[in-house]
Design a protein with these regions (language model features):
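NAD(P)+-binding Rossmann beta1-loop-alpha1 motif at the extreme N-terminus of oxidoreductases
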Residues: 1-54, 78, 115-117, 280
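Metal- and O2-centered redox machinery and metal/ROS homeostasis
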Residues: 1-9, 14-25, 89, 93, ...
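Hydrophobic beta-strand scaffold residues
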Residues: 26, 106-107, 251
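Helical "substrate-binding/catalytic lid" subdomain
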Residues: 135, 157-285
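Rossmann-like NAD(P)-binding element
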Residues: 31-94, 118-127
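Rossmann-fold dinucleotide-binding core
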Residues: 3, 67, 88-178
Length: 290
């Protein structure tokens, strides 16, 4: 089996390597010729042989539609396009319809595992029609860990929806560890915070891979002094909260984690400035001048 991989950045390059290590021939294309196997998308498609051809897109969401448009004249009926990036799930149905008009199947695939996935395997959540999923299943199994981590989540959009919720949960878990770290460091009786995090990794109910990463970071730099407390959000946390609002699903922990990231990017807080002013107005409470 040969597949094409378009987008060989931080994730795509490692995924190509893992597929090759599992004896799945993979032809990669990227705008960076240093990592690309071919010089164009057309050359990539020509190299995929006969039968249902599989093209995996590992691209930023904003590049997916234009890449699909470039692929349409190069694809044949029964080919399969997989979007493995972090696209919003609501975009999947229109993309599937666009390709279906040419007899091409579309699968949306949420992928988790980061830079460690090449070694440990990737968590894979795929959405789309059963027949197309069966065709690509050997590829998905090669990417996934040996003991699981692979699910056909449902129809078109289900893979990206599952990955969106996964990322929302990730936000909340990270925020909980971060708040615990701050309290341990805040004039507490604990004298070795990194050792506490390391001890939590074994036998406790809060052990996780994220906790392992916390422990590794604190082992490198216990006070994290070289790191600015600024946390970006990639968009999926926002989408999770928006979907919860649309469905009237209570989501206090994930919402708070998202808003905490917004707070991290403020040099000063206009909201807190006004609260301080109001406290001064009604109670004569002290104001700390900037």
């Amino acid at each position: 089996m040969t597949i094409g991989m378009i987008g060989l950045g931080r994730m795509g390059n490692h995924m190509r390597s893992r597929l090759r290590s599992k004896d799945i021939e993979t032809i990669g294309y990227d705008i960076d010729p240093e990592v690309s196997d071919v010089s164009s998308i057309a050359e990539l498609c020509d190299g995929l042989g006969t039968g249902p051809r599989i093209v995996w897109l590992m691209l930023p969401n904003q590049l997916v539609d234009e890449t699909i448009e470039a692929l349409v004249p190069l694809l044949r009926a029964d080919d399969i396009v997989i979007d493995g990036g972090n696209s919003r799930w609501t975009l999947d149905a229109p993309r599937a319809e666009r390709l279906a008009a040419h007899g091409v199947s579309y699968l949306d695939c949420g992928v988790s595992g980061g830079v460690w996935g090449e070694t440990n395997g990737y968590g894979i959540m795929v959405g789309g029609p059963e027949e197309a999923v069966r065709t690509v299943w050997p590829v998905l199994q090669a990417l996934a860990p040996e003991d699981g981590g692979l699910v056909h989540a449902g129809g078109v959009g289900a893979g990206h929806f599952a990955k969106m919720v996964h990322n929302g949960i990730e936000y909340a878990m990270m925020q909980a560890y971060a708040e615990g770290y701050e309290l341990l460091c805040a004039d507490s009786p604990v004298t070795d915070v990194p050792a506490v995090f390391d001890a939590w990794r074994q036998g406790t109910v809060i052990r996780s891979w994220l906790l392992d990463l916390c422990s590794a970071a604190l082992a490198d730099e216990p006070d994290l002094a070289s790191i600015r407390g600024w946390a970006d959000d990639s968009g999926e946390g926002r989408w999770t909260v928006e979907e919860a609002i649309d469905r009237a699903v209570p989501m206090p922990a994930i919402s708070a984690a998202l808003f905490a990231r917004f707070s991290s990017r403020q040099d000063d807080s206009p909201a807190m400035n006004l609260i301080a002013a109001m406290r001064n107005q009604f109670g004569g409470h002290a104001i700390h001048n900037s």
